[in-house]
């Protein structure tokens, strides 16, 4: 949200439409057999997004843009309410997934939407 408020150049280049989504980036890191810590940032706007990122191998997640927007639109009390909501939701999501520890999340079964399955298939078949 903050980035979107910057003045656009005359060519109307929109960085929001360029590159991979957070989920696609995490899947790419998995497909590349990455062994380094991965930070998921950009597009993290819910406890579900945090859980998805952790399941896809993120070591850390960041939702600074979302939280700043919440602070700007709903004030400090709204931000605190949102953080508390996430703190309540994350353990519930882990219970639904049958995970006692964060380290278990990447090994939990998951289903992919058709567009993500297509991304995975094309990425596996891509030549370097």
Feature-to-residue mapping (PLM):
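Active-site loop ensemble at the mouth of alpha/beta enzyme cores that anchors a bound cofactor
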Residues: 1-18
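Alpha/beta catalytic cores of nucleotide-metabolism and tRNA/nucleoside-modifying enzymes
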Residues: 13-35, 45-128
């Amino acid at each position: 949200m903050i980035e979107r408020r910057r003045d656009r150049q005359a060519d109307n280049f929109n960085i929001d439409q360029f590159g991979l989504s957070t989920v696609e980036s995490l899947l790419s890191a998995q497909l590349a057999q990455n062994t380094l810590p991965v930070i998921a940032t950009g597009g993290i706007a819910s406890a579900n997004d945090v859980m998805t990122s952790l399941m896809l191998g993120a070591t850390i997640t960041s939702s600074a843009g979302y939280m700043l927007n919440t602070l700007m639109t709903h004030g400090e009390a709204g931000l605190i309410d949102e953080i508390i909501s996430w703190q309540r939701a994350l353990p519930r999501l882990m219970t639904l997934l049958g995970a006692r520890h964060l380290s278990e999340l990447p090994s939990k079964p998951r289903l992919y939407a058709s567009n993500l399955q297509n991304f995975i298939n094309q990425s596996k078949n891509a030549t370097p």
